[in-house]
Amino acid sequence: MRDPLFKGCTRPAMLMGVPATPLAVCSGTIALLGIWFSIAFLALFPVALLAMRIMIRRDDQQFRLIWLYLRMRWLSRDRTHAFWQSTVYAPLRYAERRQRLRKP
């Protein structure tokens, strides 16, 4: 294997046992709900933190996989989805590929 991928290199940054990005999104949403409606919404933070810690107990990439699923199934509405009713993780345009193959 020429370029090995080490598991530690792909691990997300953790705060309180939860990846930093989902924690920031969740705590920001709860804080906004607490500001707009009632301070009682802030009591949801420990519950949300516990739920997120339970979710990533087996796999620390779980939130990345959930985001990828949502992006592929619900947010990606390209020509491939319109024609085949499917999604593509990394579509490759045929014209670009053909031009790259022609160049010496």
Swiss-Prot record:
Domain of life assignment: Bacteria
UniProt keyword annotations, A-Z: Cell membrane, Membrane, Transmembrane, Transmembrane helix
InterPro entries with a match to the protein in the record: T4SS_VirB3/TrbD/AvhB
Localisation: Cell membrane
TM spans (from-to): 30-50
Membrane topology per record: Single-pass membrane protein
GO cellular component, one term: plasma membrane
Family designation: Belongs to the virB3 family.
Protein name from the UniProt record: Type IV secretion system protein PtlB homolog
Gene: ptlB
